Amino acid sequence: MSINKKIEYQEVVQDILDNEEFKKLYLEPHHGISRYEHVLRVSKLTFGFCKIFKVKRISEITRAALLHDFYFDKDLEEYDAYEKLSIHPYKALDNALKYYDLNDLERDIIVKHMYPHTKKRPKY
């Protein structure tokens, strides 16, 4: 990623990365790394693909990618592994809404990123 794109990416997501609750994702294991590292990678890849393909609404899509797994394992202790697949997007959305005003696109991306486990198709 070029320095200009890195700067642009940082401007889009910095407020999320500075959030103390979001930083706690460092302590959550996810796919062999921390959940923080996972969502950071996903959002950087998303940003890069949006740039390559000249996708509109890049800021919203990138931010939703960063927030898509903003949940904690303690939130899902009562559920089995299969249930967690469809429930965790809603927990991520609930947590994101505590700190950020999200539009319909961002909400849709977060809640439906596990389609078809979430049963509803993505709207966008």
Language-model segment annotations:
Residues 1-124:
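Metal-dependent phosphohydrolase cores
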